[in-house]
């Protein structure tokens, strides 16, 4: 049960990017692991600090083959195994530190996101909230090639996606890209958790996320990536 007199609950109660109305403050760390496991293979999860102080809110959606998990949690340590998929982390508050492939990375809300290839990693967060979603590197590589206008070859795109990358969210092109992602994620959210993941609207929304993720990774190609994504007419969501 949440401790109502703890000021951290105010941070935990801030809106999640999806599934906010379904998420309640809880100390059930297995629930958080279950939601994150829809995007990356969680090996273990533990609170940073005394176990009795851990609390979180989390929710999820599935669009096509993509899992999206939104969460806000007190400081947490997460171990993730190797995967055939890659993942992107975008924070709304707080920061997260990553150790993978012998290197250290820092993701911070509003300034730096994180691209995670399918290698194992360790993540340690402050009191933080944000979104993680998974992608197929083979499919994402095709979107990178398309956004490049033919200057990036498929083998080079796949090589890029085998490397961890801090995403510069302060690049001039990012405002439009992040707005587009926000629109897509909100649309997925409004369709609710009971919508069939392989329904045409959700698959189209997944394709939009792929296109805009290519722009996150190659911001100089963002204009072409943005042009490749066209919002669906509202009637197609019915």
Predicted regions and their residues:
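N-terminal low-complexity or simple alpha-helical regulatory segments
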Residues: 1-92
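Aromatic- and glycine-enriched beta-alpha-beta binding-site module
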Residues: 87, 92-98, 104
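Alpha-helical bundle regulatory/interaction domains
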Residues: 2-24, 34-40, 47, 98-238
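Short acidic (Asp/Glu) patches
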Residues: 71-75, 92-94, 110, 115-118
